[in-house]
């Protein structure tokens, strides 16, 4: 296996990575954005290019792998499962975000969950893990979606806009927008991880056939991604990580620091890109509970190819 130094001297490989516009400027692109900023892809001899398909909703990322728009794609696990069961040979080759924290944030006049009855609540894809966790959170407070007027809005930035314009009484927000909103007087009603078990949120996906034919490129990518996760945890690189969050999201450095403090000690980020099969199984269980999948539920191993992680010494969790 080539080392980082010898790889850099080898032939450069172009690698196209599809990402939805809603993810591109969000915290969920941190591992990729940091790897770009720190030259980790370049060190592995990769000409790494982020591609944002137009139109480019999160549900279209697997399609980008099939129409030759991209080689790899950032995708939430439910979308990957649905695509694979519909005939795609797309599989997860590495994890990007494990167990996300989505906050249900409301306008200042909403003092408690019950105050949302009859009001417009912006929600993510109804078949996705965010909406599932919000339904569970509502249930903890004796409520259901039937008590609300739901509006599907893709991406934390767009949902925050709905909240600030007064068109939504509450919305689920990721970081750092949830912390930003709270600093501006909006109210935290609850968080996703109060209501659901830990699960595997987003992964890097590739077509199984393409990855097998381009193993060297995939291994280089996985090695760079693992280095990015190590950089995130390196105290000496804290400034670079904070600056990356600031550049991605437009928040102040102090707020970016709060995001990292929130994630410290939690299972939000993989340590090296390892795939949490138990967390993936939990996603499949969510999908079964909501009627998207029928019994017997498929095993998570059906939707992953671990060989590229194993090639760089990373085992599944």
Task: Name each model-derived stretch.
Residues 284-317:
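Conserved C-terminal helix/tail region of periplasmic/extracytoplasmic solute-binding proteins
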Residues 29, 58, 62, 77-80, ...:
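Extracytoplasmic/secreted envelope proteins and their assembly/folding machinery
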Residues 118, 183, 305:
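Phosphate-coordinating loops and pocket residues in cytosolic domains that bind phosphorylated ligands
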Residues 11-154, 159-165, 169-175, 188-192, ...:
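Short, glycine-/small- and polar/acidic-enriched structural segments
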Residues 212-294:
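Secondary-structure end/capping motifs
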Residues 1-7:
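C-terminal segment of classical bacterial N-terminal signal peptides
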Residues 157-248:
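Pocket-lining segment of extracytoplasmic ligand-binding domains
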């Amino acid at each position: 296996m080539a080392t980082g130094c010898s790889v850099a001297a080898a032939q450069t490989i172009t690698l196209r990575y599809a990402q939805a516009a809603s993810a591109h400027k969000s915290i969920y692109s941190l591992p990729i954005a940091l790897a770009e900023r720190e030259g980790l892809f370049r060190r592995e001899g990769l000409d790494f290019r982020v591609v944002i398909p137009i139109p480019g909703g999160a549900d279209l990322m697997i399609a980008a792998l099939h129409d030759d728009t991209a080689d790899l794609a950032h995708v939430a696990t439910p979308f990957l499962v649905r695509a694979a069961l519909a005939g795609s040979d797309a599989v997860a080759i590495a994890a990007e975000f494990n167990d996300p924290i989505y906050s249900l944030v409301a306008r200042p006049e909403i003092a408690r969950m019950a105050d949302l009855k009859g009001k417009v609540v912006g929600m993510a894809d109804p078949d996705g893990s965010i909406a599932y966790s919000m339904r569970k959170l509502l249930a903890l407070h004796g409520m259901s979606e039937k008590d609300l007027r739901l509006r599907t809005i893709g991406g934390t930035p767009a949902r925050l806009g709905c909240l600030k314009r007064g068109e939504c009484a509450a919305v689920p927000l990721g970081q750092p927008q949830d912390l930003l909103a709270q600093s501006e007087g909006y109210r935290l009603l609850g968080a996703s991880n109060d209501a659901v078990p830990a699960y595997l949120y987003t992964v890097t996906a590739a077509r199984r056939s393409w990855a097998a034919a381009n193993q060297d490129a995939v291994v280089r990518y996985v090695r760079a991604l693992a280095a990015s996760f190590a950089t995130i945890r390196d105290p000496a690189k804290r400034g670079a990580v904070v600056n990356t969050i600031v550049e991605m999201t437009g928040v102040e450095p102090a707020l970016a620091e709060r995001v990292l403090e929130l994630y410290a000690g939690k299972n939000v980020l993989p340590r090296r890109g390892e795939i949490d099969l138990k967390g993936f199984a939990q996603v499949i269980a969510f999908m079964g509970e909501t009627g998207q999948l029928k019994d017997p539920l498929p095993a998570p191993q059906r939707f992953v190819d671990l060989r590229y992680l194993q090639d760089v010494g990373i085992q599944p969790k």
